[in-house]
Regions:
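Short, glycine-/small- and polar/acidic-enriched structural segments
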Residues: 20-166, 172-186, 202
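Bacterial signal peptide processing site
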Residues: 11-16
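Compositionally biased, proline/threonine/alanine/serine-rich low-complexity intrinsically disordered stretches
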Residues: 6, 19-30, 328-338
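Conserved C-terminal helix/tail region of periplasmic/extracytoplasmic solute-binding proteins
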Residues: 295-338
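Short linear loop/turn motifs
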Residues: 68, 76, 206, 269-275, ...
């Protein structure tokens, strides 16, 4: 991401461009690959690295798939578009999936490549703020109505904290040592530090808000009617994520090609940061999920008033059925560099 663009172009996530194409044909046809689409929730970045790696390193092709990855943007409705059959697969976060299901969207999570959410609150080192309880006497920029924003408001006293809308830029942060803002640890901190700031990240996961991020989702109908196709997509994506976490360089070059605003330095920074978020503390296969995590998130969204009790069912939000349980934890592999 070039300097000026980087300064102004970092924004909220959950978006997309309109596109077409739904899954078609039986999975596994060897002579002709099955064409499917994958809708991202944002412009291509490291949070999508494993899916691009599956393409770059041929894992989709080996599985008999021809995957078109469709970039997102500021107004995407990934869950709704996947549930409606406009796209075969999508990438979203767990809170957005539950919100979609609450509105009747029949979509389900298949793979959670990141164990820890990258969401953070970025503060200046000079502010003396070392933990969330220290957030006082500051301006705090957050997206109004976001799940994490509502959680923070309920969880913390936020004494003398002036909450303002997040505008997608780190410029105000750079101008005021008493300014804090939402961030993804692999994005905004790099921009701020490149522009001379010394930052500290307070991870939302450490406060207990840790929705699965970069989820691979599909229509529930596809899971029932095309399980072989879904299995191929999930396992190829698992391989892609393992490869990206081990060797991000080739995929970062592809990411830079499809999103020229991201330069290779920020992508290398992001790949290193995201590696720390991968893994699986549940003891299951990489990318696996637990009902306890989904139930915790569901209850948090009920507590903040964003969901009604009984409006969603955590056990129906995901399945680990299609994962390759023989794969090792990708974060435990030694990195071969950029």
């Amino acid at each position: 991401m070039a300097g000026a663009v980087m300064l102004l172009g970092v924004g909220c996530r959950e978006a997309a461009r309109p596109a077409a194409e739904s899954p078609s044909g039986p999975a596994g046809a060897q002579a002709r690959p099955t064409k499917v689409t994958l809708l991202l929730n944002w412009f291509p970045e490291v949070e999508h690295g494993g899916f691009y790696a599956a393409d770059v390193h041929g894992y989709f092709r080996e599985a008999g798939l021809e995957v078109t990855i469709v970039p997102g943007g500021p107004r995407s409705a990934v869950v709704e578009q996947v549930a409606g059959g406009k796209f075969a697969f999508g990438v979203t976060n767990a809170d957005n999936l539950l919100f979609g299901q609450a509105q009747g969207a029949q979509a389900i999570a298949l793979l959670a490549p990141l164990e820890t959410s990258p969401r953070s609150i970025m503060v200046h080192e000079s502010s003396g703020i070392r933990r969330f309880e220290d957030l006082r006497n500051v301006t705090l920029a957050m997206k109004s109505g976001a799940a994490f924003e509502q959680f923070l408001r309920k969880r913390l006293p936020l004494e003398n904290v002036r909450i303002v809308p997040y505008g997608g830029s780190v410029a105000p942060f750079l101008q005021d040592d008493r300014y804090a803002q939402q961030a993804y640890v692999f994005s905004e901190p790099y921009v701020a530090e490149k522009n001379g700031a010394k930052v500290r990240n307070l991870m939302l996961a450490d406060l207990g808000f840790n929705p699965y991020t970069s989820l691979l989702i599909a229509r529930q109908k596809s899971v029932k009617e095309q399980p072989a196709l879904v299995r191929k997509m999930v396992r190829a994506s698992q391989k892609g994520w393992a490869h990206y976490l081990r060797e991000p360089g080739p995929t970062n070059r592809r990411l830079q090609e499809v999103n020229p605003e991201m330069d290779l330095d920020v992508l290398a920074f992001g790949a290193k940061a995201i590696r720390k978020l991968a893994g699986n503390n549940s003891g299951g296969p990489p990318g696996g999920m637990t009902v306890e995590r989904w139930q915790q998130l569901e209850q948090q969204l009920v507590d903040t008033g964003q969901l009604k009790p009984g409006q969603t069912h955590a056990g129906q939000a995901f399945t680990n059925e299609f994962l390759d349980r023989g794969r090792t934890n990708p974060a435990s592999s030694s990195s071969t560099g950029d």
